[in-house]
């Protein structure tokens, strides 16, 4: 089967935004205009095509990035819909990793919102070019130029309108194209056929002003254009478009368009901007990877290169089972063929290849470089794995995922649920790298951990619906940590005689605090073989094993150094096990000397509220042991930034809603660990039965 669309005519884009900026509706309209849907689905009626999990339709938010393919003006556009809620930033990171460009959707009333900033920063990290779509121009309070201003103020983005709106709120009727210098009016409800007219007289001056600003901004990025501009020569519209494309691809310039997806206005010109200014797979740098011999190598977007791809999402589909979404970076892949999962060192068979259209799937026999598709039949592949040609193996740069910050205990309601719960949790953990399920060795409870309350709510909900498992969920528990504040030299000695061969391990270790974020560091400073070389790894393993169960309240120990500097051994009785135990005893003994403390996760919280609630909200943050880090006015709202312990943030959403009559919003994400105040540390130790027991 020959390639249907050339690489140059392929676009892999994401739609990214703050929750509720109208991202899913925007994607819907794209699918409608590109002929993939015959009836428009409304998110607020729960009938959207992209939101295909039941909970997404109920809650009206997008949780899973469904990958969809569409066609527009002879181009293939693969769209990944990304969630806007902060608990799902891993989904956003995961999709940005495999995109070439993105459309950032803003709400015309609010402009840049907290989650927009988070997603924008992630896109900048991955060097993703962006077009900005100012949506909801029909909404009360919509203000296009204010929204563009927020891009400059809050994101320091070099963003410039390539369109202006004609009217706003309920008088929004079309857009001015600053490149063609004409006006598009939408006169039918579906916006299928906009009428091209002259720019209205009352907007002519504004259009000239912004056309001038656009030309100047583009000229600044290109020497040749700058010379023409300074010499007063006319810059043609072809040169202007080429300049915008170059600046956008270099992530130095962001074209801004406007419209209202809900009222079907401005979506097609936004699609044109995607084709005109966002990159084809051939415009982005080749992806780097590591060959089996450790050498670095690149893979280019080219069908003739060896096959290489990255699995970026695993899902369980009720009809076809396990689906692995992957992005092809080089080469081609036929259904029914074998590939190598080079990350895990496993051979996998690709049963079928599907191209997804939200929740309708199309089977295809081959995928080419630059494509996004889903494979059926892969057994061992998880998110972030490389799939490649068996003969030309490579491991592509993988993805890094944040550690979970919130934990809850979960119990099956019946014996029948118990067996199914284990399988369900394993499946969910396979799909989502930021979700963990484990059994507490001491209490036997099953604990699940994730990125926030909503994240865990939705996973428990999925367990009930998809796997038919009923479960009771406990109160959220914070993932505390422990560390040392002082250095000390400590002995660990394990001697046991029980007839016949005994056990003997003896170490002296200097423990001390490490820099924040450095983790555990082990140093072997043994001289003269007082502890034989073959037992050193056992000492390190003994310490690493004991770190999971801290000395105060049993929380994992982080950011400590251990230097093994002395010890002794017995010719007959010493063995690896004895040195492992001796090392873990030394760590226990360090509790008395190293001033251990409990650390708690601190969240960076941003609250956006109307001015009149400012005093109450600030007071409430302080009462939650938070400290305010900064404030600013944003439009007619106040933004409060603070660091608050996670332990005091449970139930905050409900408090904020009731305290501001539903007008306040907040986002939070893990920032760093901090020492817990003494009185609270005592409560935590007491609640955990104290862990500092003699072994």
From Swiss-Prot:
One of its GO terms (cellular component) is cytoplasm. It comes from the Bacteria. It is found in: Cytoplasm. GO terms for molecular function: GTP binding; GTPase activity; translation elongation factor activity. Gene3D superfamilies: 3.30.230.10, 3.30.70.240, Elongation Factor G (Translational Gtpase), domain 3, P-loop containing nucleotide triphosphate hydrolases, Translation factors. InterPro entries: EFG_II, EFG_III, EFG_III/V, EFG_IV, EFG_V, EFG_V-like, EFTu-like_2, G_TR_CS. GTP binds at residues 17-24, 81-85, 135-138. Belongs to the TRAFAC class translation factor GTPase superfamily. Classic translation factor GTPase family. EF-G/EF-2 subfamily. This is Elongation factor G. It comes from Listeria welshimeri serovar 6b (strain ATCC 35897 / DSM 20650 / CCUG 15529 / CIP 8149 / NCTC 11857 / SLCC 5334 / V8).
